Protein backbone atom coordinates (compact mmCIF):
# COMPACT_ATOMS: atom_id res chain seq x y z
CA UNK A 1 0.00 0.00 0.00
CA UNK A 2 2.83 2.34 0.72
CA UNK A 3 4.18 1.72 -2.75
CA UNK A 4 0.85 2.63 -4.32
CA UNK A 5 0.66 5.87 -2.35
CA UNK A 6 4.18 6.80 -3.37
CA UNK A 7 3.37 5.93 -6.95
CA UNK A 8 0.29 8.14 -6.90
CA UNK A 9 2.31 10.95 -5.33
CA UNK A 10 5.03 10.54 -7.92
CA UNK A 11 2.43 10.33 -10.68
CA UNK A 12 0.33 13.34 -9.77
CA UNK A 13 2.42 15.32 -7.31
CA UNK A 14 6.02 15.57 -8.31
CA UNK A 15 5.48 15.40 -12.06
CA UNK A 16 2.83 18.08 -11.89
CA UNK A 17 5.07 20.27 -9.79
CA UNK A 18 7.98 19.70 -12.17
CA UNK A 19 5.86 20.43 -15.22
CA UNK A 20 4.44 23.55 -13.64
CA UNK A 21 7.85 24.73 -12.52
CA UNK A 22 9.16 24.06 -16.01
CA UNK A 23 6.25 25.90 -17.58
CA UNK A 24 6.58 28.81 -15.17
CA UNK A 25 10.33 28.88 -15.75
CA UNK A 26 9.82 28.98 -19.51
CA UNK A 27 7.34 31.78 -19.11
CA UNK A 28 9.76 33.68 -16.95
CA UNK A 29 12.51 33.17 -19.51
CA UNK A 30 10.26 34.32 -22.30
CA UNK A 31 9.12 37.25 -20.23
CA UNK A 32 12.74 38.07 -19.50
CA UNK A 33 13.52 37.98 -23.19
CA UNK A 34 10.73 40.43 -23.96
CA UNK A 35 11.06 42.54 -20.85
CA UNK A 36 13.67 44.70 -22.53
CA UNK A 37 11.42 45.33 -25.53
CA UNK A 38 8.13 46.06 -23.82
CA UNK A 39 7.27 47.43 -20.41
CA UNK A 40 4.32 45.50 -18.92
CA UNK A 41 1.89 47.75 -17.03
CA UNK A 42 1.31 47.34 -13.31
CA UNK A 43 -2.25 46.06 -13.77
CA UNK A 44 -1.08 43.17 -15.88
CA UNK A 45 1.62 42.35 -13.31
CA UNK A 46 -0.91 42.33 -10.49
CA UNK A 47 -3.30 40.22 -12.54
CA UNK A 48 -0.50 37.78 -13.32
CA UNK A 49 0.44 37.45 -9.66
CA UNK A 50 -3.18 36.86 -8.68
CA UNK A 51 -3.59 34.24 -11.38
CA UNK A 52 -0.40 32.47 -10.33
CA UNK A 53 -1.59 32.41 -6.72
CA UNK A 54 -4.92 30.91 -7.78
CA UNK A 55 -3.13 28.40 -9.93
CA UNK A 56 -0.93 27.40 -7.01
CA UNK A 57 -3.95 26.99 -4.74
CA UNK A 58 -5.74 24.89 -7.31
CA UNK A 59 -2.67 22.76 -7.81
CA UNK A 60 -2.38 22.22 -4.08
CA UNK A 61 -6.04 21.27 -3.82
CA UNK A 62 -5.73 18.85 -6.71
CA UNK A 63 -2.66 17.28 -5.19
CA UNK A 64 -4.37 16.97 -1.82
CA UNK A 65 -7.43 15.33 -3.42
CA UNK A 66 -5.25 12.95 -5.36
CA UNK A 67 -3.25 11.97 -2.31
CA UNK A 68 -6.42 11.50 -0.25
CA UNK A 69 -7.97 9.30 -2.89
CA UNK A 70 -4.77 7.35 -3.22
CA UNK A 71 -4.51 6.79 0.52
CA UNK A 72 -8.17 5.77 0.68
CA UNK A 73 -7.65 3.31 -2.13
CA UNK A 74 -4.56 1.94 -0.47
CA UNK A 75 -6.44 1.61 2.81
CA UNK A 76 -9.32 -0.19 1.15
CA UNK A 77 -6.99 -2.53 -0.70
CA UNK A 78 -4.99 -3.22 2.43
CA UNK A 79 -8.19 -3.88 4.40
CA UNK A 80 -9.39 -6.28 1.76
CA UNK A 81 -6.07 -8.06 1.70
CA UNK A 82 -6.02 -8.31 5.49
CA UNK A 83 -9.56 -9.60 5.49
CA UNK A 84 -8.77 -12.16 2.89
CA UNK A 85 -5.64 -13.30 4.60
CA UNK A 86 -7.37 -13.55 7.96
CA UNK A 87 -10.19 -15.51 6.45
CA UNK A 88 -7.73 -17.77 4.69
CA UNK A 89 -5.91 -18.46 7.86
CA UNK A 90 -9.09 -19.06 9.72
CA UNK A 91 -10.93 -21.16 7.24
CA UNK A 92 -8.11 -22.04 5.00
CA UNK A 93 -9.80 -20.23 2.12
CA UNK A 94 -7.85 -20.32 -1.09
CA UNK A 95 -7.92 -17.16 -3.30
CA UNK A 96 -8.56 -18.06 -6.82
CA UNK A 97 -7.31 -16.34 -9.96
CA UNK A 98 -10.69 -14.86 -10.75
CA UNK A 99 -10.80 -13.01 -7.46
CA UNK A 100 -7.36 -11.63 -8.04
CA UNK A 101 -8.33 -10.44 -11.49
CA UNK A 102 -11.43 -8.86 -10.02
CA UNK A 103 -9.37 -6.98 -7.44
CA UNK A 104 -6.99 -5.79 -10.16
CA UNK A 105 -9.91 -4.53 -12.27
CA UNK A 106 -11.33 -2.66 -9.31
CA UNK A 107 -8.01 -0.96 -8.67
CA UNK A 108 -7.73 -0.15 -12.36
CA UNK A 109 -11.13 1.51 -12.50
CA UNK A 110 -10.51 3.42 -9.31
CA UNK A 111 -7.14 4.64 -10.46
CA UNK A 112 -8.61 5.59 -13.85
CA UNK A 113 -11.26 7.70 -12.23
CA UNK A 114 -8.63 9.42 -10.11
CA UNK A 115 -6.50 10.04 -13.19
CA UNK A 116 -9.45 11.53 -15.08
CA UNK A 117 -10.17 13.88 -12.19
CA UNK A 118 -6.56 15.00 -12.10
CA UNK A 119 -6.57 15.45 -15.89
CA UNK A 120 -9.66 17.62 -15.69
CA UNK A 121 -8.00 19.76 -13.06
CA UNK A 122 -4.90 20.10 -15.20
CA UNK A 123 -6.98 21.06 -18.25
CA UNK A 124 -8.66 23.82 -16.27
CA UNK A 125 -5.31 25.08 -15.10
CA UNK A 126 -3.92 25.03 -18.64
CA UNK A 127 -6.94 26.92 -19.98
CA UNK A 128 -6.54 29.54 -17.28
CA UNK A 129 -2.87 29.93 -18.08
CA UNK A 130 -3.69 30.29 -21.79
CA UNK A 131 -6.22 33.02 -21.04
CA UNK A 132 -3.74 34.90 -18.88
CA UNK A 133 -1.01 34.60 -21.49
CA UNK A 134 -3.36 35.75 -24.25
CA UNK A 135 -4.37 38.76 -22.21
CA UNK A 136 -0.73 39.67 -21.60
CA UNK A 137 0.16 39.18 -25.25
CA UNK A 138 -2.74 41.36 -26.37
CA UNK A 139 -1.69 44.02 -23.88
CA UNK A 140 1.86 43.99 -25.19
CA UNK A 141 0.63 44.12 -28.79
CA UNK A 142 -1.56 47.14 -27.99
CA UNK A 143 1.38 48.92 -26.37
CA UNK A 144 3.55 48.12 -29.38
CA UNK A 145 0.91 49.45 -31.78
CA UNK A 146 0.57 52.65 -29.79
CA UNK A 147 4.32 53.21 -29.86
CA UNK A 148 4.42 52.52 -33.61
CA UNK A 149 1.55 54.96 -34.19
CA UNK A 150 3.30 57.70 -32.23
CA UNK A 151 6.51 57.07 -34.16
CA UNK A 152 4.64 57.22 -37.49
CA UNK A 153 2.95 60.48 -36.47
CA UNK A 154 6.30 62.02 -35.61
CA UNK A 155 7.75 60.86 -38.93
CA UNK A 156 4.81 62.28 -40.89
CA UNK A 157 5.11 65.61 -39.07
CA UNK A 158 8.83 65.81 -39.87
CA UNK A 159 8.24 64.90 -43.50
CA UNK A 160 5.49 67.49 -43.84
CA UNK A 161 7.81 70.15 -42.42
CA UNK A 162 10.56 69.19 -44.85
CA UNK A 163 8.13 69.23 -47.78
CA UNK A 164 6.83 72.66 -46.75
CA UNK A 165 10.38 74.00 -46.53
CA UNK A 166 11.26 72.63 -49.96
CA UNK A 167 8.05 74.06 -51.44
CA UNK A 168 8.74 77.46 -49.90
CA UNK A 169 12.26 77.43 -51.34
CA UNK A 170 10.97 76.50 -54.79
CA UNK A 171 8.29 79.21 -54.57
CA UNK A 172 10.87 81.82 -53.63
CA UNK A 173 13.20 80.65 -56.40
CA UNK A 174 10.33 80.89 -58.90
CA UNK A 175 9.37 84.45 -57.94
CA UNK A 176 12.83 85.95 -57.37
CA UNK A 177 13.75 86.13 -61.09
CA UNK A 178 10.37 87.72 -61.82
CA UNK A 179 11.12 90.46 -59.33
CA UNK A 180 14.56 90.94 -60.87
CA UNK A 181 13.01 91.10 -64.36
CA UNK A 182 10.53 93.70 -63.11
CA UNK A 183 13.37 95.74 -61.67
CA UNK A 184 15.32 95.36 -64.91
CA UNK A 185 12.29 96.43 -66.93
CA UNK A 186 11.79 99.46 -64.70
CA UNK A 187 15.46 100.35 -65.01
CA UNK A 188 15.40 99.98 -68.80
CA UNK A 189 12.18 102.00 -68.96
CA UNK A 190 13.80 104.76 -66.91
CA UNK A 191 16.88 104.66 -69.15
CA UNK A 192 14.74 104.81 -72.26
CA UNK A 193 12.70 107.66 -70.81
CA UNK A 194 15.85 109.62 -69.99
CA UNK A 195 17.21 108.93 -73.48
CA UNK A 196 13.93 110.06 -75.03
CA UNK A 197 14.01 113.23 -72.95
CA UNK A 198 17.61 113.85 -74.00
CA UNK A 199 16.70 113.27 -77.64
CA UNK A 200 13.76 115.65 -77.31
CA UNK A 201 16.03 118.27 -75.77
CA UNK A 202 18.55 117.83 -78.55
CA UNK A 203 15.81 118.00 -81.15
CA UNK A 204 14.43 121.18 -79.60
CA UNK A 205 17.89 122.71 -79.49
CA UNK A 206 18.54 121.77 -83.10
CA UNK A 207 15.17 123.08 -84.21
CA UNK A 208 15.72 126.33 -82.32
CA UNK A 209 19.24 126.68 -83.73
CA UNK A 210 17.97 125.92 -87.24
CA UNK A 211 15.20 128.49 -86.91
CA UNK A 212 17.74 131.04 -85.70
CA UNK A 213 20.10 130.21 -88.56
CA UNK A 214 17.26 130.55 -91.05
CA UNK A 215 16.30 133.90 -89.59
CA UNK A 216 19.90 135.06 -89.78
CA UNK A 217 20.19 133.78 -93.34
CA UNK A 218 17.04 135.62 -94.36
CA UNK A 219 18.24 138.81 -92.71
CA UNK A 220 21.61 138.47 -94.39
CA UNK A 221 20.07 137.73 -97.77
CA UNK A 222 17.62 140.64 -97.51
CA UNK A 223 20.04 143.13 -95.98
CA UNK A 224 22.91 144.87 -97.57
CA UNK A 225 25.94 145.35 -95.35
CA UNK A 226 28.09 148.43 -95.88
CA UNK A 227 31.59 147.13 -95.97
CA UNK A 228 33.45 143.87 -96.21
CA UNK A 229 32.98 140.82 -93.96
CA UNK A 230 35.93 138.46 -93.65
CA UNK A 231 35.77 135.19 -91.64
CA UNK A 232 38.64 132.77 -91.41
CA UNK A 233 38.76 130.26 -88.54
CA UNK A 234 38.06 132.15 -85.32
CA UNK A 235 39.11 135.61 -86.64
CA UNK A 236 36.35 138.06 -87.34
CA UNK A 237 36.63 141.45 -89.03
CA UNK A 238 33.63 143.52 -89.89
CA UNK A 239 33.67 146.65 -92.00
CA UNK A 240 30.49 148.48 -92.84
CA UNK A 241 29.73 151.76 -94.66
CA UNK A 242 27.14 154.34 -93.82
CA UNK A 243 24.36 152.73 -95.83
CA UNK A 244 22.94 149.72 -93.93
CA UNK A 245 20.20 147.14 -94.13
CA UNK A 246 19.12 147.67 -97.71
CA UNK A 247 16.52 145.30 -99.13
CA UNK A 248 17.80 142.69 -101.55
CA UNK A 249 16.90 143.07 -105.22
CA UNK A 250 17.92 141.41 -108.43
CA UNK A 251 20.74 143.91 -108.91
CA UNK A 252 22.10 144.23 -105.39
CA UNK A 253 21.75 140.58 -104.21
CA UNK A 254 25.19 139.28 -103.15
CA UNK A 255 26.81 136.49 -105.09
CA UNK A 256 28.90 133.69 -103.68
CA UNK A 257 32.46 133.24 -104.88
CA UNK A 258 34.85 130.44 -103.98
CA UNK A 259 38.56 130.67 -103.48
CA UNK A 260 40.52 127.51 -102.86
CA UNK A 261 43.86 127.31 -101.19
CA UNK A 262 46.07 124.55 -99.88
CA UNK A 263 44.82 124.70 -96.31
CA UNK A 264 41.55 126.64 -96.22
CA UNK A 265 38.48 127.17 -98.37
CA UNK A 266 37.12 130.71 -98.73
CA UNK A 267 33.51 131.70 -99.46
CA UNK A 268 33.07 135.29 -100.69
CA UNK A 269 29.80 137.19 -100.90
CA UNK A 270 30.03 139.90 -103.61
CA UNK A 271 27.62 142.82 -103.95
CA UNK A 272 26.47 144.32 -107.31
CA UNK A 273 27.48 147.65 -108.79
CA UNK A 274 24.67 149.74 -107.32
CA UNK A 275 26.08 149.32 -103.84
CA UNK A 276 28.20 152.12 -102.61
CA UNK A 277 31.12 150.08 -101.34
CA UNK A 278 32.40 146.52 -101.67
CA UNK A 279 30.32 144.20 -99.52
CA UNK A 280 30.95 140.53 -98.73
CA UNK A 281 29.44 138.08 -96.29
CA UNK A 282 30.22 134.44 -95.49
CA UNK A 283 27.01 132.49 -95.89
CA UNK A 284 27.86 129.78 -93.38
CA UNK A 285 24.51 128.08 -93.49
CA UNK A 286 24.51 127.74 -97.29
CA UNK A 287 28.10 126.48 -97.29
CA UNK A 288 27.26 123.75 -94.81
CA UNK A 289 23.89 122.72 -96.18
CA UNK A 290 24.84 122.81 -99.92
CA UNK A 291 26.86 119.80 -101.15
CA UNK A 292 29.84 120.13 -103.48
CA UNK A 293 28.20 118.86 -106.67
CA UNK A 294 25.50 121.59 -106.45
CA UNK A 295 27.90 124.50 -106.19
CA UNK A 296 28.32 126.98 -109.02
CA UNK A 297 31.08 126.44 -111.52
CA UNK A 298 33.72 128.97 -112.54
CA UNK A 299 32.19 129.48 -115.97
CA UNK A 300 28.83 130.37 -114.46
CA UNK A 301 30.53 132.76 -112.06
CA UNK A 302 32.36 134.41 -114.95
CA UNK A 303 29.13 134.87 -116.89
CA UNK A 304 27.44 136.43 -113.90
CA UNK A 305 30.42 138.70 -113.27
CA UNK A 306 30.46 139.85 -116.91
CA UNK A 307 26.77 140.75 -116.84
CA UNK A 308 27.02 142.62 -113.55
CA UNK A 309 27.96 146.31 -113.36
CA UNK A 310 31.37 147.41 -112.13
CA UNK A 311 31.70 147.67 -108.42
CA UNK A 312 32.23 150.94 -106.68
CA UNK A 313 34.00 151.26 -103.41
CA UNK A 314 32.98 153.54 -100.60
CA UNK A 315 34.81 154.75 -97.63
CA UNK A 316 35.15 152.11 -95.00
CA UNK A 317 33.95 152.84 -91.55
CA UNK A 318 34.74 150.97 -88.38
CA UNK A 319 31.79 149.67 -86.40
CA UNK A 320 31.20 150.19 -82.74
CA UNK A 321 31.79 147.52 -80.09
CA UNK A 322 28.06 146.80 -79.65
CA UNK A 323 27.55 146.14 -83.35
CA UNK A 324 30.56 143.82 -83.46
CA UNK A 325 29.28 141.81 -80.45
CA UNK A 326 25.78 141.55 -81.98
CA UNK A 327 27.16 140.24 -85.27
CA UNK A 328 29.42 137.80 -83.41
CA UNK A 329 26.48 136.42 -81.39
CA UNK A 330 24.45 135.92 -84.58
CA UNK A 331 27.31 134.01 -86.20
CA UNK A 332 27.80 131.87 -83.07
CA UNK A 333 24.05 131.02 -83.09
CA UNK A 334 24.43 129.82 -86.66
CA UNK A 335 27.46 127.67 -85.77
CA UNK A 336 25.71 126.03 -82.77
CA UNK A 337 23.21 124.31 -85.09
CA UNK A 338 25.90 121.89 -86.25
CA UNK A 339 27.97 119.67 -84.00
CA UNK A 340 31.15 119.41 -86.11
CA UNK A 341 31.12 122.14 -88.76
CA UNK A 342 34.01 122.32 -91.22
CA UNK A 343 36.38 125.25 -90.99
CA UNK A 344 35.60 127.89 -93.64
CA UNK A 345 36.78 131.40 -94.19
CA UNK A 346 35.49 134.32 -96.15
CA UNK A 347 37.37 137.23 -97.62
CA UNK A 348 36.44 140.23 -99.59
CA UNK A 349 37.14 140.14 -103.27
CA UNK A 350 37.98 143.69 -104.22
CA UNK A 351 37.50 144.56 -107.85
Curated annotation (Swiss-Prot):
Organism: Arabidopsis thaliana
Biased composition (Low complexity): 324-337
Binding partners and assembly: Binds to multiple calmodulin (CaM) in the presence of Ca(2+) and CaM-like proteins.
Motif (Nuclear localization signal): 191-198
Main location: nucleus
Family: Belongs to the IQD family.
Tagged with keyword Flavoprotein: no
Gene3D superfamilies given in the database record: 1.20.5.190
Presence of keyword Cytoplasm: yes
PROSITE patterns assigned: IQ
Gene name for this UniProt entry: IQD27
Protein name: Protein IQ-DOMAIN 27
Amino acid sequence: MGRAARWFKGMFGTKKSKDRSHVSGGDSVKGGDHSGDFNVPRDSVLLGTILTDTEKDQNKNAIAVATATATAADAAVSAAVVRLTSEGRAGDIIITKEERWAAVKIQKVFRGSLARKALRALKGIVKLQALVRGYLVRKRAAAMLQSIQTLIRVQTAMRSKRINRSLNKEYNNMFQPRQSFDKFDEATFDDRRTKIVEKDDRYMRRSSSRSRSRQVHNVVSMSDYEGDFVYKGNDLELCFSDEKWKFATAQNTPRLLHHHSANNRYYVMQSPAKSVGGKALCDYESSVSTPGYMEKTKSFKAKVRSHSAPRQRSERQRLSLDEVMASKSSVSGVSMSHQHPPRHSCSCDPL
